[in-house]
């Protein structure tokens, strides 16, 4: 019930003042570092459910409208995808370039608090300079459509959703070929940005692990920075080689260890250089001679999925019978150091 427009958050033009808030939340939008920062407290709690509209910020008076922000930033908080989006521009630049505050938010009337956002976006509204700025990340992504929350990575099981990632990386796990593939982007960046695991994709419940992907790709989904990270290698290549999911690598959980392979071969997949290497022997012969699948390698546990291989080899672990079998080639060569490669041998593979 504001007689005059109030400067508080981002949702503002006179037009927007007639548009409802997307929905009510049972949790705040963000957590303020300083609970005495009324402007932040208002922004974070604005969609929670106010019984009566509350005036919470010094910046909301006509007087304050002429008072600059207490401190200025040398850089914008984020970058808007649409430079004509006044609400976004205000939010991202509010402590940088405004000599006089701009009226940009509408969620401040009792009426507007019940009105949803005008539309959903398929792309983020802006890109945050600091991806750890949760308020900014939320703002930029708040109108994106998630059709259904999906579990996509081994690291997002029901157990994992309560457990933070074991460690933070300074680099992504992998690089997505399509930066618009949200599932891939989440997987590759999951240990960098998120303090708490987020359910965002679908491919990873125990059920989904046995269901083939809806379509096959001719190129990997992404490129792993560490080819010894079996979980990443599986994720990036999962829609290329498998007609039906086969238990062969990191994903040989205790459950899967009891499930036979869908078909048998009359010849081994490859020949091991060291016949005492049980992991290699199992891999090469898994569809030939085992009556029941055997768990033979420490490297197939969820723990091992995060542990790099103990050492690098100068020779392949084994030799593949079929040089076009990418799974076998990757397995046999995964710990080799390629320093000076002779590409004349098989340019298609080595290239």
UniProtKB/Swiss-Prot annotation:
The record marks 2, 50, 98, 146, 194, 242, 290, 338 as: Endothelin-receptor binding site. InterPro entries: Endothelin (IPR020475), Endothelin_toxin_CS (IPR019764), Endothln-like_toxin (IPR001928). The keyword Repeat applies. GO terms for molecular function: endothelin B receptor binding; hormone activity; toxin activity. The keyword Secreted applies. It is found in: Secreted. Disulfide bonds join 30-44, 32-40, 78-92, 80-88, 126-140, 128-136, 174-188, 176-184, 222-236, 224-232, 270-284, 272-280, 318-332, 320-328. Residues 6-341 are annotated as: 7 X 48 AA tandem repeats. Sequence repeats lie at residues 6-53, 54-101, 102-149, 150-197, 198-245, 246-293, 294-341. Keywords: Cardiotoxin, Disulfide bond, G-protein coupled receptor impairing toxin, Repeat, Secreted, Toxin, Vasoactive, Vasoconstrictor. Residues 6-29, 54-77, 102-125, 150-173, 198-221, 246-269, 294-317, 342-351 form a propeptide. Expressed by the venom gland. One of its GO terms (cellular component) is extracellular space. GO terms for biological process: intracellular calcium ion homeostasis; regulation of systemic arterial blood pressure by endothelin; regulation of vasoconstriction; vein smooth muscle contraction. Vasoconstrictor activity. These toxins cause cardiac arrest probably as a result of coronary vasospasm. The major effects of sarafotoxin-m are a progressive decrease in heart rate (bradycardia) that turns into an arrhythmic phase that is followed by an A-V block. Belongs to the endothelin/sarafotoxin family. This is Long-sarafotoxin. The lineage of its organism: Eukaryota, Metazoa, Chordata, Craniata, Vertebrata.
């Amino acid at each position: 019930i504001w007689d005059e427009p109030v400067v508080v958050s981002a949702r503002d033009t006179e037009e927007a003042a007639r548009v409802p808030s997307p929905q009510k939340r049972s949790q705040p939008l963000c957590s303020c570092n300083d609970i005495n920062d009324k402007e932040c407290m208002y922004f974070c709690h604005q969609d929670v459910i106010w019984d009566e509209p509350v005036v919470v910020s010094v910046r909301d008076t006509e007087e304050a409208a002429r008072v600059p922000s207490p401190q200025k930033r040398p850089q914008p908080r984020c970058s808007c995808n649409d430079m004509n989006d006044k609400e976004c521009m205000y939010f991202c630049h509010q402590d940088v370039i405004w000599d006089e505050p701009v009226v940009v938010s509408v969620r401040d009337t009792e009426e507007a608090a019940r009105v949803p956002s005008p539309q959903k976006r398929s792309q983020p509204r802006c890109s945050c300079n600091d991806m750890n700025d949760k308020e900014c990340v939320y703002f930029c992504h708040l109108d994106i459509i998630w059709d259904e929350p999906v579990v996509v990575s081994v690291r997002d099981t029901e157990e994992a959703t309560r457990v933070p990632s074991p460690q933070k990386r300074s680099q992504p796990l992998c690089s997505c070929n399509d930066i618009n593939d949200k599932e891939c982007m989440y997987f590759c960046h999951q240990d960098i940005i998120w303090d708490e695991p987020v359910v965002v994709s679908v491919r990873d419940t125990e059920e989904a692990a046995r269901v083939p992907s809806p379509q096959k790709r001719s190129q990997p989904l992404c490129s792993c920075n560490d080819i010894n990270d079996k979980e990443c290698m599986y994720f990036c290549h999962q829609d290329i080689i498998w007609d039906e999911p086969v238990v062969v690598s990191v994903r040989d959980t205790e459950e899967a260890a009891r499930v036979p392979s869908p078909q048998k071969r009359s010849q081994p997949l490859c020949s091991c250089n060291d016949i005492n290497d049980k992991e290699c022997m199992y891999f090469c012969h898994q569809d030939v001679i085992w009556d029941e699948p055997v768990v033979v390698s420490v490297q197939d546990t969820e723990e091992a999925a995060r542990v790099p291989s103990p050492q690098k080899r100068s020779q392949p672990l084994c030799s593949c019978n079929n040089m076009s079998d990418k799974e076998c080639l990757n397995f046999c060569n995964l710990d080799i150091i390629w320093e000076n490669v002779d590409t004349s041998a098989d340019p298609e593979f080595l290239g």
